[in-house]
Design a protein with these regions (language model features):
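Well-ordered alpha-helical scaffold segments within catalytic/enzyme domains
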Residues: 30-45, 85-99, 154-155, 163-180, ...
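Long, well-ordered core segments of solenoidal/helical folds
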Residues: 1-10, 45-68, 104-124, 184-204, ...
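Solvent-exposed beta-hairpin/edge-strand motifs
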Residues: 323-342
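Glycine- and aromatic-rich loop/turn segments at beta-sheet edges
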Residues: 2-20, 59-77, 117-153, 198-217
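C-terminal beta-strand-rich structural cap/linker in extracellular carbohydrate-active enzymes
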Residues: 229, 349-372
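Carbohydrate-binding surface patches
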Residues: 172, 272-327
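Catalytic cores of secreted or luminal carbohydrate-active enzymes
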Residues: 224-284
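Structural signature of alpha-solenoid helical repeat scaffolds
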Residues: 19, 23-26, 43, 74, ...
Length: 372
């Protein structure tokens, strides 16, 4: 095993001889998480034992000292989003073992990582011109964004923060765990109103804030990471806002990029019914892009669940039209919908559309029956 007797690892190993590299550095990263994955997949207790040794070493050497290294060898492993991964890795260790020390270490690490999230300058709504385009100041805000790597030599110095904000879903979960509003506010600041940084041709977000709307350049695989963190975030919001009456089990963290955890490996629950998330083209039309709409299908294929969430602090209204034939092999009964949170029956207007009004950061779930 590459794990050392004390539970730690070398930062890197030679490809051909297996000898440790970068021996002037310590591996202050959650490398032990690989054993968490192995234990969950294989069930052999030796992997859990190794994860415990590694996590305990990490807490002593990284968390207790407030010192972390990153994953980017081209920047001498300076601290980066691996610190965010450490939070989730320690939370997973708490879930596996029930040991309170891992939860405590996770929350301490989370508060340290929060200091690397941008909170300044505070944007306003004054009109500015940036790279030849007129816009309001908040449209290119840095608030809520994380950096690729920090310090005096990291990319944050030259390129600013990044738009790949993989911490958002985790920060929502940390708010649930701690009731510390800062986590939720930073997650929402990072996730919303980022259209100015989308590439006009691909609608993919630019990686570095400084590159504005140029897109990901030679890294198109960033699109997968964007899908991952966005999905993790919006479903985390749904889970939190519903008081966990909506819940979807997550898989493992994405390698390198951050603490996002994706779902889809097994069904979740939507107000007492097992369901799987779905994305069906042409399922519905809605007229307010500030309201997020998630969709799920119960495992018995008898109900469609639509989860509507207001992404702003203001009361909003949306008109929602559901298309009856959008799901192959089923017909959606659009004559009425049930609100499982209240037990109310909701009927559409004369035009067949549902009128939905949501308070600031509100949520409403609709369940529609499906027929063969």
């Amino acid at each position: 095993s590459l794990q050392q007797a004390d539970g730690g690892f070398a930062v890197a190993y030679g490809k051909h001889d297996g000898e440790p590299l970068f021996t002037d550095l310590k591996d202050l990263r959650p490398t032990f998480y690989g054993f968490v994955v192995a234990y969950k997949l294989l069930g052999e207790h030796k992997y859990l034992d190794a994860a415990v040794r590694g996590a305990d070493w990490f807490v002593r050497n990284a968390v207790d000292k407030g010192a972390f290294t990153g994953v980017c060898g081209d920047a001498r492993f300076i601290n980066d989003f691996a610190t965010g991964q450490a939070v989730q890795a320690l939370l997973d260790m708490h879930g596996l073992t029930g040991e309170a020390r891992y939860r405590d270490a996770a929350l301490r690490t989370a508060r340290m990582y929060a200091t690397s999230i941008y909170t300044h300058p505070t944007p306003g709504d004054r009109e500015i011109e940036y790279k030849g385009r007129k816009m309001q100041e908040w449209q290119i805000s840095q608030v809520g964004l994380c950096f690729e790597h920090g310090g005096c030599a990291g990319s944050a110095v030259k390129s600013g923060p990044i738009l790949l904000t993989s911490h958002c879903g985790m920060f929502v979960r940390l708010y649930e765990e701690t009731a510390d509003r800062l986590f939720l506010d930073l997650a929402r600041a990072a996730a919303t109103a980022r259209e100015a940084h989308l590439a006009p041709d691909t609608h993919m977000a630019t990686y570095y804030w400084s590159q504005f709307d140029r897109g990901p350049g030679p890294f198109p695989h960033h699109a997968w990471w964007q899908l991952g963190w966005i999905a993790d975030y919006v479903f985390a919001e749904a889970e939190m806002r519903s008081g966990r009456r909506i819940s979807f089990p997550r898989g493992f963290m994405t390698p390198k990029v951050g603490p996002q955890r994706i779902f889809g490996f097994e069904p979740g629950t939507v107000y007492g019914e097992q369901a799987n998330p779905i994305m069906v083209k042409g399922l519905f039309d809605a007229d307010n892009t500030d309201i997020e709409i998630l969709s799920a299908l119960t495992t018995d294929r008898n109900r469609l669940c639509l989860i509507l969430m207001n992404s702003t602090p203001r009361k909003l209204h949306a008109t929602l039209t559901v298309h009856p034939a959008a799901i192959p092999g089923r017909r959606i009964d659009t004559a009425s919908a049930a609100d499982p949170a209240t037990g109310r029956k909701i009927t559409p207007g004369d035009d067949g559309a549902f009128g939905i009004t949501l308070p600031g950061y509100g949520i409403q779930t609709l369940k529609l029956d499906l027929e063969p």
